[in-house]
């Protein structure tokens, strides 16, 4: 994904895998992407750090949510003062660097908006990471648009 972003979006980002989120280092990660149900393994301190980070402008993406119930509990713990809203990706992430051409919404997603900007994006029963690893062009374009959205809003 990052190579595609660099080559086609002319945006250069670094990534780290398996970070240990602490109060001291979280600001080093403006975009935090967590896969599957790994959000369930976060400590209460890490959840508090992420909540503060999101409120300060960080972007938190949860990929491939498999349980509405546990996800709802997590969101309530993370950001109790905000309501999650349904997100139609083609309405928000289209016409940035790339025009997206999905025949229909490829997955269900929701998020939390702060100051009219998506601060948390939850993707249900679909893995963007897998689509990127499989070099699916449409989802690589979507990934570039998501990052561009974050950087320009």
Predicted region positions:
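Short alpha-beta junction capping motif
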Residues: 31-71
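Short, well-ordered loop/turn elements at secondary-structure boundaries
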Residues: 28, 55-56, 114-116
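Surface-exposed patches in mature extracellular/periplasmic domains of secreted proteins
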Residues: 9-21, 62-65, 86-92
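Alpha-helical scaffolding within the catalytic cores
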Residues: 16-21, 43-49, 103-109
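An acidic, glycine-rich "communication" segment
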Residues: 67-149
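Aromatic-Pro/Gly-enriched surface loop or interdomain linker
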Residues: 1-31, 35-38, 119-120, 127-128, ...
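Residues at alpha-helix termini
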Residues: 7, 55-56, 81
